[in-house]
Amino acid sequence: MITTKKTLLSEIEKTIKELNFESITEERKLILQPLVAFIQSKVENHQEIRLNLICTHNSRRSHLSQVWAQTAAAFYGIKNVFCYSGGTEATAMFPMIAKTLLKQGFQIKTIAKGTNPIYAIKYAENEYPIIGFSKTFDDSFNPKSEFAAILTCSSADQGCPYIAGAEKRIPITFEDPKVFDNTTQQVEKYEERSIQIATEMCFVFSQIALYYGIK
């Protein structure tokens, strides 16, 4: 299940290398531990690792979490990782998410416009791009079984007591940057939330890499 690290786009590499794991509290590490354990069990059993990152509208936090989890897996050399996202309802990926990721080094191309645009999000020159658009967590685009459901907001956690097909349900909630929309702090707070999610997803995959001695 382990492979060599992927070469990411240079600005993303720079962003990741500047992350500070010491900013993660011990309490927060306990929240992340079930995800570490899920990934570890899949690696040990030579199984594919499927993560479905879920929030209410699949518009902000779930997209950031999907993108950074997939990127972290590549950076730390954990193969056969497939990350998805969804919501309890479909809306659209909020434009500030694309702008934030673009600023942090991702290449983003709009491949379909409309009320629910579809984006191709590249983190490495030779890897398939992440396809970003809003959908429900049980959309046909997402896996039907053998996945972990990662709840990235408390309302989705409370509103989805049962997620069909999920092997494991793991709440890892983040504060919504939406509260800063239409304020002078919007750009700063979206970047801040993205960096928090990047830090925590990279920490999770770094634990797997550490166990297997990947440098």
Residue positions per predicted region:
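Short polar/charged helix/loop
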Residues: 2-215
